[in-house]
Regions:
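Positively charged n-region of N-terminal signal peptides that target proteins for export
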Residues: 1-4
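Bacterial N-terminal signal peptides
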Residues: 7-19
Length: 422
């Protein structure tokens, strides 16, 4: 009986898959690039179970090896309230998967000699020079101390500026309680208002001493705007998105794009509490480089393949191979406290490069992979990783803003490596 029930659920799940859309990369049979077709079918089974259990509305998964797409499927529903089937060209709120793209934008300016890593942040926005460091005393009070050294542009890329996010379960210090959540400043004001707001807060740590996940890449986006004299979205469109053929990437979905926005369940399947992705229905007043972009999974796998190729895709070069190599090296030296695994438990054995997490060790992590793997994810349910040793890029989109998103990241990576036979 259980087999019959599962077969029926799988059939219903398969019926919700979208008709074929244009593939974002050349395609190959799994066996041609070292995958097992039956192994990759476990991805279908996994999402069939999750959708049948109403733990996630739907997903889009893209897997490429050797530059060839071997798995590109849509599962379940785009909008669980309306019952709309999930299309391959669904548009996802990327949240922090915006950060690697903003980092690439900054590195294009570095290559032009316009934004060196060792530049002082205060050279672009002087108010950062006056920020103090909040040191928590034994009685819980904050003592404000001067910066031991200035915040550098380098600190923004690797999250060692001392800036943080509020509203995160891994950031519950007295300093964190003073900070807004990741998207609030972009909803409430423009770039200048964001800078004025953030520079009135204390830093969580002395610059260059500890990895602290937060607004660093948002500030980098503001610096990019200052240097380029363009909005971040305009600069990304001209220098990253359009050259790579990322046709739906944007900070402001158009009226034509909005019907393709992936939406979550109204209530968190784990807690039963109301949940929402505010950016789906709220126009931001600034292009926040840390959290506010949208794209399809097909768009983002082209971005990932560009990085895996050393900065080029289909004849369009975005960065030099040497710059990509520098970006994807670990920039957390022994003098810096590495708290990357605090953001996500499965990131033991990871350091951090310029806008991406970088695996530095065999073992340690809860998920398979190789040293040199680069990745980052989004709080609304998106996932991205590249494994240069395996010539592999994987991008996943779900609308799952609760804690379930972390479960999917681990399970998907387990399934992908389990399907690799060569």
């Amino acid at each position: 009986m259980n087999k019959l029930i599962f077969a029926a659920a799988a059939a219903a799940f398969t019926a919700l898959a979208t008709p074929l859309a244009a593939a974002p990369l050349a395609e190959a049979r799994p066996e041609e690039v070292g995958f097992s077709t039956s192994g990759l079918a476990r991805m279908d089974d996994f999402f069939a179970r999750e959708i049948a259990a109403k733990r996630v509305p739907g997903a889009v998964v893209a897997i490429a090896r050797d530059g060839k797409l071997v798995h590109y499927k849509a599962y379940g529903q785009l909008d669980p309230v309306k019952g709309t089937p999930m299309p391959l060209d669904a548009i996802f709120a990327l949240a922090s998967m915006t950060k690697p793209m903003a980092a690439v934008a900054g590195l294009t300016l570095m290559e032009q000699g316009r934004l060196p890593l060792q530049a002082k942040l205060a050279d672009y926005y002087p108010a950062f020079a006056d920020m103090k460091v909040g040191v928590v005393q034994a009685d819980g009070a904050l003592k404000l101390e001067p910066q031991a050294r200035p915040i550098l542009i380098h600190d923004l890329y690797r999250h060692t500026s001392g800036l943080m996010y509020g509203g995160r379960p891994d950031s519950a210090s007295p300093v964190a309680r003073l900070y807004p959540d990741g998207i609030a400043p972009a909803i409430e004001g423009d770039t200048q208002a964001f800078i004025e707001r953030i520079t009135k807060l204390p830093l969580a740590h002395q610059p260059g001493t500890q990895f602290e996940y937060g607004f660093s890449i948002d500030v980098l986006g503001a610096v990019i705007e200052k240097v380029s004299e363009q909005r971040l979205g305009e600069y990304l469109a001209a220098n990253v998105w359009k050259p790579l053929g990322m046709n739906d990437a944007t900070f402001a979905p158009s009226d034509a794009q909005r019907p393709r926005l992936a939406r979550p369940f109204p209530n968190d399947p784990l807690t039963g509490k109301p949940q929402a992705i505010r950016l789906l229905d709220t126009v931001t007043k600034s292009d926040c480089g840390g959290a506010c972009s949208f794209a399809t999974i097909g768009d983002y796998i082209r971005f990932g393949q560009m990085l895996l190729n050393g900065g080029e895709l289909d004849g369009a070069r975005v960065l030099s191979p040497k710059t990509v190599h520098h970006m994807t090296a670990n920039h957390l030296g022994p003098e810096i406290k590495n708290m990357v695994a605090n953001v996500e438990p499965h990131r033991a054995g990871f350091g951090f490069g310029l806008g991406v997490a970088v695996r530095t060790s065999e073992g340690l992590s809860a998920v398979p992979g190789n040293p040199g793997e680069l990745s980052w994810n989004g709080a609304f349910g998106t996932q991205f990783f590249c494994d240069p040793k395996e010539r592999l890029v994987v991008v996943v989109g779900t609308a799952a803003p609760g804690e379930l998103r972390k479960y999917y990241r681990e399970q998907v990576q387990d399934i992908v490596y389990g399907a690799m036979v060569k």
